[in-house]
Swiss-Prot record:
Taxonomic path: Bacteria, Bacillati, Actinomycetota, Actinomycetes, Frankiales
GO MF term set: 2-isopropylmalate synthase activity; 4-hydroxy-2-oxovalerate aldolase activity; manganese ion binding
Residues annotated for substrate binding in this entry: 14-15, 168, 197, 288
Site positions for Transition state stabilizer: 14
GO term, biological process aspect, one: L-leucine biosynthetic process
Ribosomal protein keyword on record: no
Domain Pyruvate carboxyltransferase: 6-258
Name this polypeptide is given: 4-hydroxy-2-oxovalerate aldolase 2
CDD domains: DRE_TIM_HOA (cd07943)
The keyword Zinc belongs to this UniProt entry's keyword annotation: no
Stored Gene3D superfamilies: 1.10.8.60, Aldolase class I
Keyword field: Aromatic hydrocarbons catabolism, Lyase, Manganese, Metal-binding
InterPro entries: 2-IPM_HCS-like, 4OH_2_O-val_aldolase, Aldolase_TIM, DmpG_comm, DRE_TIM_HOA, PYR_CT
UniProt EC number: 4.1.3.39
Amino acid sequence: MSGPNIYLQDVTLRDGMHAIRHRVDPERVGAIVAALDKAGVRAIEVTHGDGLAGSSLTYGPGSHTNWEWIEAAVTNASQATITTLLLPGVGTIAELRRAHAMGVGSVRVATHCTEADVAAQHIAAARELGMDVSGFLMMSHMAEPAELAAQAKLMESYGAHCVYVTDSGGRLTTDRVRERVRAYRDVLRPDTQIGIHAHENLSLSVANSFAAVEEGAYRVDASLAGQGAGAGNCPIEPFVAVALLLGWDLDCDLLALEDAAEDLVRPLQDRPVRVDRETLTLGFAGVYSSFLRHAEIAAETYGVDARSILIEAGRRKLVGGQEDMLVDIALAIQPK
């Protein structure tokens, strides 16, 4: 094998929670983790879609607690690192400590792309615990490359081992991904890793992930069957297939990943995870991908087109945590 040595992280059981409204049995979590672990995936993120303490009326209640899901994951992982997500202001350092005590070895601390400063305490606390820590700059399309890189530099200064270009809206085209990764590489230390988190809303997630790696990204997020918010994340099966065709240093069992996607993940979907008129609108309008299910509920409740809600959300530049505003938009555009 040749080519770049990359760190593949699965997000089926975190970002993918949005696609199934955060509803899955711990037993299925354990089965998915076991399959990913056996297939050679290096890290597996597990939590409510909005991270530790994310279960709420705003984001959507989970069918089980994060602790039940994490316990199932840790129990079934023999090689992979179990990872979790923390949004400052939602999850707390106390919850991070509990997750670490349960066996979680890595955390991504997520902020809006221009608000890295709110992550300082949480990144520092994770480092004190001895955890692997990544900064997760969400909605990365909303900041120009230089501004985004300056925010990445802040996360590095707080102690992040890695900082992600996080395309939460699936809005970035391939050239814009390249620009942001290059901007990171220009300002970050050589030993600070770069990650890419892509969404499929414009059908670019695989291409964008490869482009990021070509520009120097090391960590790549992907998910079984593309399970994730909106049209989903970078689907792990075609990503691995192309990487293997290119001779990249990626020790994953493609057939096992295909089986896990078809047998364990697709049956969970009550709404297909795919590019369609609503999810394409997310990418076109630059809207947070996890708004999809909330917008569809508001559209059905108030008799409006979900796309109209999403387009207006994009015009208003809504960000994560403003899900309640989707109802306001639906009421405003409701036929009188």
